[in-house]
């Protein structure tokens, strides 16, 4: 049955490609124009929410722990900081409108009112890029430098490393784990507890990072769009069979390298062109299999797009233009290498 669903999905994409601009379809799949795939994005959002909750909860456990009775001033500052984090969490991650439609952790989005989906769609990206999530990701980046020690709960980083401060939370240097750990007021049990808190804080931050890194995109849909668009356009451009075959046979690169493409996409500030640029770059870098004939065919395909746009007196989408320029530049490099 699942296979039949995928076939119908591909048939729908094939039909849609005939009637829509391919780049617009690409934008829709990526979600760069506000469209999101709820079946992918909602579970991702929940994972981020859960890991953020765990991160703040761990700090709350530390604040209430008996070991902090020895550090009255630090305890007060940590209590205020945790309160601010909880307030931010409530503001960013409470979506009871969708949650009330969950049954056994699953949501039938066909039953969710459109206004609820639209509200979530509008707010989703600002939530996962919020100051709270950014703070935790920066905390993760700091702690990841000491990954091996923390995962082994090795106190080396709090005892031997140079410096007097080990503060893993940006903008909150008052939480100095090195100071807490090395205090004469602590028993060995207290020291072990502090190291355990640091370990749990890191694993929760890693949970946020791993959830953020989940693509918002169905890679198979993206592959189908590329293949369907190629099958449509190659009927209109004769004598470019080898170039089209090269594109079609290289679609596997999209799936193979997609996590890297997606990381670049997020790092670029969600510029959707990045994914296609990196994909075409990977195709064109296989210079052993790109003969002068195939290079010429690629140029013919590019010229077709340019002529089609000029005929319709349209201004080329800047993102498409950048993509075309990138391909042309790569082809020029390959031509020079073969001379």
From Swiss-Prot:
Keywords: Host cytoplasm, Host nucleus, Host-virus interaction, Late protein. One of its GO terms (cellular component) is host cell cytoplasm. It is found in: Host cytoplasm; Host nucleus. Induction: Expressed in the late phase of the viral replicative cycle. It comes from the Viruses. Interacts with host NACA (alpha chain of nascent polypeptide-associated complex). Belongs to the asfivirus H339R family. This is Protein H339R.
């Amino acid at each position: 049955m699942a296979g039949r669903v995928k076939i119908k999905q591909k048939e729908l994409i094939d039909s849609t490609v005939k009637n829509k601009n391919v780049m617009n379809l690409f934008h829709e799949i990526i979600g760069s124009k506000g469209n999101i795939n709820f079946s992918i994005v909602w579970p991702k959002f929940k994972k981020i929410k859960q890991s953020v909750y765990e991160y703040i909860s761990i700090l709350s456990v530390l604040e209430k722990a008996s070991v902090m009775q020895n550090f009255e001033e630090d305890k007060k500052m940590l209590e205020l900081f945790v309160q601010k984090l909880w307030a931010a969490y409530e503001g960013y991650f409470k979506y009871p409108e969708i949650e009330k439609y969950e049954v056994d952790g699953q949501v039938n989005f066909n039953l969710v009112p459109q206004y609820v989906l639209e509200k979530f769609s509008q707010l989703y990206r600002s939530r996962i890029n919020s100051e709270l999530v950014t703070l935790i990701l920066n905390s993760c980046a700091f702690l990841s430098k000491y990954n091996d020690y923390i995962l082994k709960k090795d106190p080396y980083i709090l005892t031997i490393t140079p410096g007097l401060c080990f503060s893993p939370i940006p903008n909150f240097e008052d939480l100095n784990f090195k100071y807490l750990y090395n205090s004469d007021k602590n028993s060995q049990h207290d020291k072990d507890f502090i190291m355990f808190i640091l370990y749990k804080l890191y694993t929760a931050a890693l949970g946020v990072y791993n959830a953020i890194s989940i693509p918002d995109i169905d890679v198979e849909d993206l592959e189908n769009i590329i293949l369907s668009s190629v099958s449509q356009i190659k009927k209109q451009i004769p004598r470019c069979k080898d170039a089209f075959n090269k594109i079609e046979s290289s679609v596997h690169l999209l799936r193979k390298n997609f996590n890297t493409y997606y990381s670049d996409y997020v790092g670029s500030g969600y510029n959707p062109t990045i994914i296609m640029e990196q994909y075409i770059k990977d195709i064109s870098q296989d210079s052993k299999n790109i003969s002068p004939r195939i290079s010429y065919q690629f140029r013919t395909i590019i010229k077709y797009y340019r002529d089609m746009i000029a005929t319709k007196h349209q201004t080329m989408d800047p993102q498409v233009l950048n993509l075309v320029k990138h391909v042309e530049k790569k082809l020029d490099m390959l031509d020079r290498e073969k001379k």
